[in-house]
Curated annotation (Swiss-Prot):
Substrate binds at T61, D136, E196, K226, D230. It comes from Cupriavidus metallidurans (strain ATCC 43123 / DSM 2839 / NBRC 102507 / CH34) (Ralstonia metallidurans). Its main location: cytoplasm. The lineage of its organism: Bacteria, Pseudomonadati, Pseudomonadota, Betaproteobacteria, Burkholderiales. It is found in: Cytoplasm. Binds 1 NAD(+) per subunit. NAD(+) binds at residues 197-199, 231, 260-265, 283, 318, 339-341, 384. GO terms for biological process: L-homocysteine biosynthetic process; one-carbon metabolic process; S-adenosylmethionine cycle. This is Adenosylhomocysteinase. Belongs to the adenosylhomocysteinase family. Its cofactor is NAD(+). Pathway: Amino-acid biosynthesis; L-homocysteine biosynthesis; L-homocysteine from S-adenosyl-L-homocysteine: step 1/1. Keywords: Cytoplasm, Hydrolase, NAD, One-carbon metabolism. May play a key role in the regulation of the intracellular concentration of adenosylhomocysteine. It holds the Pfam family AdoHcyase_NAD.
Amino acid sequence: MNAVTDLKQDYIVADIGLAGWGRKEIAIAETEMPGLMAIRDEFAAAQPLKGARIAGSLHMTIQTAVLIETLKALGADVRWASCNIFSTQDHAAAAIAASGTPVFAFKGESLKEYWDFTHRIFDWADGGTPNMILDDGGDATLLLHLGARAEKDASLIAKPTSEEETFLFAAIKEKLAKDSTWYSRNLAAIRGVTEETTTGVHRLYQMAQKGELKFPAINVNDSVTKSKFDNLYGCRESLVDGIKRATDVMIAGKIAVVAGYGDVGKGSAQALRALSAQVWVTEIDPICALQAAMEGYRVVTMDYAAEHGDIFVTCTGNYHVITHDHMAKMKDQAIVCNIGHFDNEIDIASVEKYEWDEIKPQVDHVKFPDGKKIIILAKGRLVNLGCATGHPSYVMSSSFANQTIAQIELWAERDSGKYPVGVYVLPKHLDEKVARLQLRKLNAQLTELTEQQAAYIGVKKEGPYKADHYRY
């Protein structure tokens, strides 16, 4: 990739000439994102994000372009990088760069470039720092926290345990050699973060439990209108899109093994069954396993499924769910992919020693010593974004409406004391607001409670209608 970097411009993209194409697709996406566009229209005059300088680390797609332009329309200053080396849509990045927003992203970044670009979102052109983070997976948040700790204890970045850590640690060392307090200065300036996905939320809760988190965070992922829609319905459409674009495989009749039966796994299993695959599920949680069984899926272990499955999809957010030994047992031409945030759900490092033959970008044959080949998609990273274009605009509207509301909330309350350091979720009435805005596009008609009915079930007529502990 010969990325375009103009020293007179504050961006790095694949081809700025793609901006026109990107702008046309952004215009189409806006018509499919009613919730986000309604938030833009509602708050534009008030400029609730005026003064906010947002460092964004989230997949640089067409839908994200609509989010970025919403944040700017509400008064924010924004710099952006993708949170995945394969997920950028180059025409989207070009359109945003051409509009004057600094963006550092192209499809197929190296890990070195990835961490370089993540650093760039914190380097404001005027020499200042950001004061907010919008994160997906937690890498931007991790970078500042780890870097600040490494300023005091270099041993923290002395012994990487993975390829990802090798490049992360090297990037931190390089930055510290130039500016020994860069991380702590940036960290001190951040007033809050809003986190998009399950993996990043896990990181935030772990940091909070250890006393390491240095600013308040809103867990956007666990808003109902995010997790029960983006994670489930988004994956239900984008998983198979990625597999089909990559392989053109016939799914009907195949044994498809879905590792993990959370919201992402549920959507993935539904998609594969809709195309008449025989869907097997692996699970550690007896409740999720029981749900899968009651839906008619066969619940098995990966040890058992490895030699039988034709298509494998990891959806757990966990580590080495598919191991070297599992892949060694697989059928010739088995398809292996991941739709969880990071690439370590599949032990890709363990098979790097074998012969890899690139069929096309993000589609590789891996040849084992016995001559068998398996097909690995997107090198174990997100298949729906590596091999396709991710979730549809409509479902991302819910997620990004929540992101925007969360940014407004944290920024508005930055000095009020409402959010001491910790991890929070948006209140129920805002969740319901996003759902109402989304329903407009579907011509849905909501039934209204009478005063008597509202009193009978103990809620306000206008909502919220469910207790915080309610499980949708």
